[in-house]
Amino acid sequence: MEMLTAICGCVMAVQSLIAVSVADDAYAREARAFLANRDKTVQPRQIAEIRKAARGETNDLAAVRSARNVMAALPEGVTAEWVTPKMRLYRLQGKDKLPLLVYLHGGGWVIGSIASCSAFCGAVAKEGVAVLALDYPLAPEHPYPAALDAVCSAYREIVTHPSRFGCDPNRVTIGGDSSGGNLALTAALALQQEGLKPAALLPYYPVTEARVDGTISWREFDTGFGMDGAFMEACNAAYLQGRDWADPLISPMCATDDELRKLPSVHILGADHDVLRDQGKAFADRLKSLGCRVRYELPRGTTHLYITVPGQPSVFRRAVQFAVEACLQSDRKN
């Protein structure tokens, strides 16, 4: 009997490894196709306009931003309500007191909008988690701390008036991709100064240090992998505008050990071929070393943008599943 149990255990382990291998192959194959088909002129134009805007020449930045402002169609059974002109609430029809994900789009704090994350928000809502997308103010017109202040203000509004958002105030997760993931982490650090604590945090390939970090992933994937290092560098400059990158409310990796220990559970899904890969992994490793509740996954072969730009459907589906897992497991007492 013991031998049979051991054999069954080995078979299950092999099946799990095969499933992971198949998923990794799909992730890598789709990422290669995504990069091969991507318009190579988009990012250089974005970088040039962001740098100009940081110098005060903002006339052409609107055109760059508009490219990521197309709202996705809603999945069947999902409604989307403009709670305010800056907040869009996604949820299943007729459902109330749901766990809520406050979602913050990526785009280097400079581009992106509620529309750019709309497909993701709708997909998560389809699975029974309400999602509130926040259109936070963008740099360089509104540099740090404008976006952070908007996120914290939205969180206070949600937990103070949960019926307005149809949610359980004890199960409010804050998440986002790239710079949005940064805002999720920094908002939690800022809110803890007020005695407020989200149920969980859900950053996807987050910025944890707003600087050129010199890591292996930054050097290896600096150009041609979805988000160039030069793009991130231009966005950092537009957002900081001379402020100290090492401020923990800009770079959460710079928070003290005590501050990090007070965070709720953190669920990080990275991107493999990405300049931000290593800083995200380092942040997760630090949380683990401090005894924090952290879940970290790195889907092999993936690249930046899988949340907001179509083309990597397998990891997009995993990202949706990852969000649902985080939100349904969330508990304010964590």
Predicted regions: what they are:
Residues M1-A6:
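Bacterial N-terminal signal peptides that target proteins for export
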Residues C8-A23:
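Bacterial Sec-dependent signal peptides at the C-terminal "C-region" and cleavage site
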Residues V20-N334:
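Alpha/beta-hydrolase superfamily serine-hydrolase fold, recognizing
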